[in-house]
Regions:
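Canonical Radical SAM [4Fe-4S] cluster-binding loop centered on the CxxxCxxC motif
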Residues: 27-70
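N-terminal [4Fe-4S]-dependent radical SAM core
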Residues: 1-37, 81-84
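Short loop/turn segments at strand-loop or loop-helix junctions that form parts
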Residues: 39-43, 50-54, 91-94, 150-156
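Radical SAM/AdoMet-radical enzyme domain recognition
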Residues: 72-90, 99-156
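Conserved non-cysteine loop/helix-boundary elements of the Radical SAM core domain that shape
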Residues: 56-67, 94-100, 154-156
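Conserved aromatic-histidine-acidic binding/catalytic patches
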Residues: 28, 32, 36, 94-97, ...
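Short low-complexity stretches enriched in small and charged residues
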Residues: 5-10, 42, 46, 70-74, ...
Length: 156
């Protein structure tokens, strides 16, 4: 995508199911899991020289939270129409915790967890947010069957 394209406002709910990559992992927990890997934005509060240039952006070009929620609903609707009812969402960026609606996105995903066979969420983060933020994160992920974090080590 070019810089001229306002991808932060792109309506991802219009993507046909056949263009969404899904992975059924029968060896993982013995069920098909629809996996979504989502880069929530390029902004990162660290500017490490060894990180990929995409993630060293100062641009806070996050998609609007409401559009993210609609996209989640559409992905799940299409996945369910195609026989999936177990989901794994992997959220990264830049630094995903700086998406202004990150906790809202988690709460939206969690609200549907009871209606699924299995729902998990994973975050790759530099863990730079304060403890109050992480306390809110812990509360937001309680409804999930599983939640995990990969902490990035930053030596610069």
């Amino acid at each position: 995508m070019t810089e001229d394209l306002k991808w932060s406002n792109y309506d991802f709910t219009k993507i046909p199911f056949d263009d969404i990559v899904s992975v059924g992992q029968r060896t993982l927990l013995y069920r098909d899991i629809f996996t979504v890997s989502w880069l929530l934005g390029r902004f990162c509060n660290y500017k490490c020289s060894y990180c990929w240039p995409y993630a060293r952006s100062n641009r806070k070009d996050h998609r609007p939270t409401e559009l993210c929620l609609k996209t989640i609903d559409e992905i799940k609707r299409q996945a369910r129409e195609n026989g999936f009812n177990s989901f794994h969402f992997s959220l990264s960026g830049g630094e995903p915790t700086f998406h202004p609606g990150y906790l809202d996105i988690l709460q939206h995903l969690a609200a549907d967890a009871a209606n699924t066979n299995y729902t998990s969420v994973h975050m790759t983060s530099n863990c730079s947010r304060n403890m109050v933020w992480f306390e809110q994160y812990v509360e937001a992920v309680k409804p999930f069957h599983r939640a995990s974090i990969t902490a990035s080590l930053h030596t610069e």
